[in-house]
């Protein structure tokens, strides 16, 4: 099943995993099933290689390309489901450069 956006979800830094995380939910699931999406800094940097490759550049790219990131997350979740590793007991997926350039 695809994921749907949660526009109230603010991006949070996950410095240990060098990623930015935000929440989406499984479409049509009742009760709502949240899924944590982690996007690597490197993947976000590839969305605009002219931007500075640091944390602030990654956050800026997340804000600019959020809809593209959400589409990639939904596509990956729909195809493969969640990752084996959970986030605080909740389903999670991690996006890499390959997921965003597909």
Language-model segments: which ranges?
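The feature marks short-to-medium sequence segments in extracytoplasmic or secretory-pathway proteins
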Residues: 12-16, 39-41, 55
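Short, charged/polar N-terminal "headpieces" of proteins
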Residues: 1-32
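Acidic, low-complexity intrinsically disordered segments
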Residues: 3, 50-102
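A short, structured beta-strand/loop element
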Residues: 21-50
